[in-house]
Structures are given as C-alpha cells and as structure tokens.
C-alpha cells in the first residue's frame, strides 16, 4: 500500500474510486486506484491509500508512453466530463484552463514568451475526453505485468494532447533531442 496526503479535491478521489474503477475493468493497463479504509472511507485524517504496483519509471520510453496515452483515453470513452475539472484551483489546473482559452483571468504566472505562445494558439477540433495529464513520470514498467499508470491526473482534453505533454516533458525533463 502507498499512503499519501490528499493532494486534490475529494471529488477527484471519489471519481477515481467509482468512475475510473468501472471503466478500467479488463483494460490493458494497470491503474492505481484508491483503496478504502476498513471503515469504508477513502480519506482518513487527510491521507489516502493506493495499491503498490510493481514496476519502475524508465526514462526514454516516450513512444511507449504515447501508446499508453492512446490506450488510456478510450477506457473512458463513455465517461461524462467530471465536474471537478472546473473546481480545481491549483497552478496546473489554472495553467491548463489558460492554455486552452477557457480562463480569461490572464496568465497564471508572469513569464517571458507568454504573449507569443498565446498568439500561437489555434482551435483544436479533436473531441475532448478523459486523459491522464501527466503520464511521463507516472507509468511503471515491469517485464511481468502490463504498464501501471499511477497518480492519475484527470483532464478533459483531446487524447493527443496527453501525447503532446509527453513530448514536451521528454525534451524539458528527460533530455530528449528536439528532433525525436
């Protein structure tokens, strides 16, 4: 069992327990979903529990991560847009809403090149759905088991967006060459 402090909204945890569990049955991926306490609670004194899943993060497996992103999204093809995606107020959620033009409050941080990036935005026509917004460091590989997806970070975006995040993470955090 892996214990961690609740770092999101309780609604997210309940969604993982109910909706994600229902939609992930029989999938080709192992998903780390919350474990209830002996009293049936998902949160106990601010802490949550998740199963230990065998495997390890292996930098450089970006093409496999892209394949996993493309396998993850269809698991939830029938799932409705979770209400909690609009209620989150952490920096990643604010940046996501700003990047997609759904938050008119201005950039979440003052950073160089934001205006250039905003002017480069284009309309995306691909349909949105459930994606994992941070797969790069959250997939465990094990030769005896299917890939394990941990720390599920759910967003309502087109599936290929999660692949784009993997590409950017690969270059920025794992030393991938820009041309790969």
Predicted features, each with a name:
Residues 85-105:
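Alpha-helical scaffold segments that mediate packing/assembly in large oligomeric complexes
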Residues 20, 55-90, 112-125:
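Conserved kinase catalytic-core helix
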Residues 136-142:
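Conserved protein-kinase catalytic-loop segment immediately C-terminal to the catalytic Asp
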């Amino acid at each position: 069992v892996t214990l961690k402090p609740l770092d999101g909204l309780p609604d997210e945890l309940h969604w993982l327990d109910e909706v994600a569990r229902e939609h992930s049955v029989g999938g080709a991926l192992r998903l780390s979903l919350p474990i209830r306490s002996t009293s049936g609670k998902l949160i106990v004194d601010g802490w949550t529990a998740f199963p230990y899943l065998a495997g390890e993060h292996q930098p450089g497996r970006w093409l496999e991560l892209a394949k996993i992103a493309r396998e993850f999204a269809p698991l939830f093809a029938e799932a409705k847009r979770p209400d909690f995606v609009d209620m989150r107020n952490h920096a990643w959620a604010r940046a996501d809403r700003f990047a997609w033009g759904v938050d008119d409050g201005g950039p979440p941080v003052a950073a160089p090149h934001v205006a250039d990036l905003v002017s480069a935005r284009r309309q995306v026509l691909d349909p949105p759905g459930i994606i994992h917004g941070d797969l790069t460091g959250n997939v465990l590989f094990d030769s005896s088991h299917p890939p394990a997806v941990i720390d599920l970070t759910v967003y309502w975006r087109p599936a290929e967006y999660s692949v784009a995040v993997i590409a950017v993470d690969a270059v920025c955090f794992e030393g991938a060459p820009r041309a790969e």
